[in-house]
């Protein structure tokens, strides 16, 4: 089985029944990752696998810290032959380190799962996560950030983190769009 096939099976088993909306979002993020495949030459399976797995840490069976990037990555780390690139992308997706700081978990996250040194893959995953609604539909990063703030409140841990990350989220979205335009990739 391919890494992508394995990733879909795992994410579906963890999210489809218990968190169907998260499963829809994860599928939408993975669909976006497939659209970006021409930009990440030779690494498209890593991107798509990380995209479909990025929110598995919300699954009730995996919650340990309540910080989904860390909980999801810790679970993935226990699976033999799990690709370290996928694990680290899940752990650090969408500025997770900023949220980890808000939660007092930055030492654990950085120590266990160092930032992945492939800016294009990191940016591509941020792009896909931040341009996909909770229902798996396409949206703008502005609408997505507003939706997150509306769901979690401005002064919550997530609200504080997303406000800190917001300028960089929008910059990444624009950067990925520009790369896609230059490469003739339709988003």
Regions found by a protein language model. Name each.
Residues 5, 9, 24-31, 35, ...:
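A broad detector of short, well-ordered amphipathic alpha-helices
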Residues 44-79, 87-98:
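His-Asp-centered metal-binding catalytic motifs of divalent-metal-dependent phosphohydrolases/nucleases
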Residues 8, 67, 95, 113-116, ...:
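Phenylalanine-focused residue identity feature
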Residues 1-2, 14-42, 53, 79-82, ...:
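Divalent metal-dependent phosphate-bond-processing catalytic cores, especially two-metal-ion Mg2+/Mn2+ enzymes
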